[in-house]
């Protein structure tokens, strides 16, 4: 077990070996109901497998079924264009990279997205994002390469139609991790 700041640059070495075994046994990407990308299981069928995976802290990652990657892959599979799927979904589906999801903000009850303050404004063919997030699931993992950032893009719309999820590489200029948060004394390294 690594200690101190080194905990953020390390993940269990056995994971890669277990991933290869899971792929060989057909125990890979079980969460995606779309058979083109996943195993084609219903949520009910997957629930039984998720319950079993929950008995080990590394099983879901070893089978490429851990959050926030699962939700992020579902979003990109369902709403991403061909370029998004080629650049981000395929490496996620292969288990080559990890992802992060950024919604929670300081000073707001971020489980209610209508409170969100972060914004994204279209500038030409790119979005300029402004805002601070308080907790970004997965951002601490050294393999994290893509971020889904939830923000307000249509401030004049009704409160439940104001938001978008923006894909951004973690290495984008301006993306900065200031500190890893502790919740009930835990920081969930290296995942965060």
State the predicted function of each range.
Residues 107-111, 137-142, 155-157, 183-190:
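Short Gly/Pro-enriched turn/cap motifs at secondary-structure boundaries
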Residues 60-73, 93-105, 132-147:
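FAD-binding core of FAD-dependent oxidoreductases
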Residues 1-67, 74, 78, 83-94, ...:
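Amphipathic, small/basic residue-rich leader segments at the start of a protein or domain
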Residues 88, 134, 178-182:
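Short beta-alpha junctions and helix-cap segments that line functional grooves
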Residues 118-121:
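A structural signal for short hydrophobic beta-strand segments in well-ordered beta-sheet cores
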């Amino acid at each position: 077990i690594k200690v101190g700041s080194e905990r953020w640059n390390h993940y269990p070495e056995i994971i890669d070996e277990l991933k290869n075994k899971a792929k060989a046994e057909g125990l890979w990407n079980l969460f995606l109901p779309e058979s083109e990308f996943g195993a084609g299981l219903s949520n009910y069928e997957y629930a039984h497998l998720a319950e079993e995976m929950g008995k080990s802290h590394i099983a879901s990652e070893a089978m490429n079924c851990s959050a926030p990657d699962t939700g992020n892959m579902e979003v990109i599979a369902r709403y991403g264009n061909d370029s998004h799927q080629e650049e981000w979904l395929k490496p996620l589906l292969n288990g080559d990279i990890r992802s992060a999801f950024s919604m929670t903000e300081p000073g707001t009850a971020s489980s209610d997205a209508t409170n969100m303050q972060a914004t994204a404004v279209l500038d030409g063919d790119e979005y300029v994002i402004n805002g601070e997030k308080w907790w970004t699931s997965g951002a601490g993992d050294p393999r994290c390469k893509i971020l889904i950032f939830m923000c307000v893009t249509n401030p004049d719309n009704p409160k439940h139609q104001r938001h978008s999820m923006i894909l951004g590489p973690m290495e984008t200029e301006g993306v900065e991790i200031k500190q890893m948060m502790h919740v009930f004394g835990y920081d969930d390294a290296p995942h965060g």
